């Protein structure tokens, strides 16, 4: 009797370990980084859009490895348009992911370098950081680079001199973090 019980218990433990392994594989497979073709509806009235994630009240709240969605809200009564950004879990479909933050080298108190210079500098820094984050050369990647540079008003009051760089796939959403994805 003891032997039959031991064999039965052994079989049960073996079966449970197989189930646990297959559920781990399934969970890992669900979060494989990728690009989801097509864009979810991100424009609509305040009442019709379903927002996901934490609402960002100030774009400078976004930081490295934050994944985010962008929405365009239209007020049905006035026709006013406003843009809204939310931080979401990177395992959920998202529009973009912040991969780097770079402080402009100008000394405190120096005037704003201008939009053209700021965009040029941001493009260089974002390009330089792309391969280290994604794991592939930009020219071979399906991802594009975007940046959120400081605005003149924020620069002049000394609040922000940091540019945030992000990756996105035009016309699509991302799934999982793009860190080391090679996409």
What is each model feature region?
Residues 1-9:
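Bacterial N-terminal signal peptides that target proteins for export
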Residues 17-20:
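C-terminal motif of bacterial Sec signal peptides marking the signal peptidase cleavage site
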Residues 22-183:
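Primary mode marks residue(s) on the alpha4-beta5-alpha5 output face of response regulator receiver
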């Amino acid at each position: 009797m003891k032997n039959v019980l031991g064999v039965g218990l052994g079989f049960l433990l073996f079966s449970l370990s197989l189930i646990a392994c297959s559920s781990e594989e399934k969970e890992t497979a669900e979060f494989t980084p990728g690009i989801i073709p097509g864009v979810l509806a991100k424009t609509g009235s305040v009442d019709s859009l379903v927002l996901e994630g934490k609402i960002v009240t100030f774009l400078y709240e976004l930081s490295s490895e934050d994944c985010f969605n962008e929405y365009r809200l239209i007020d049905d009564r006035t026709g006013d348009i406003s843009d809204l950004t939310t931080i979401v879990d990177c395992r959920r479909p998202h529009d973009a992911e912040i991969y780097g933050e770079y402080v402009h080298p100008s000394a405190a108190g120096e005037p704003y370098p201008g939009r053209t210079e700021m965009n040029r500098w941001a493009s260089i820094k974002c390009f330089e950081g792309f391969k280290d984050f994604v794991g592939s050369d930009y020219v071979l990647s399906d991802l594009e680079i975007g940046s959120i540079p400081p605005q003149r008003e924020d620069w002049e009051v000394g609040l922000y001199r940091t540019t945030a760089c992000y990756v996105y796939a035009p016309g699509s959403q991302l799934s999982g973090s793009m860190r080391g994805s090679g996409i």
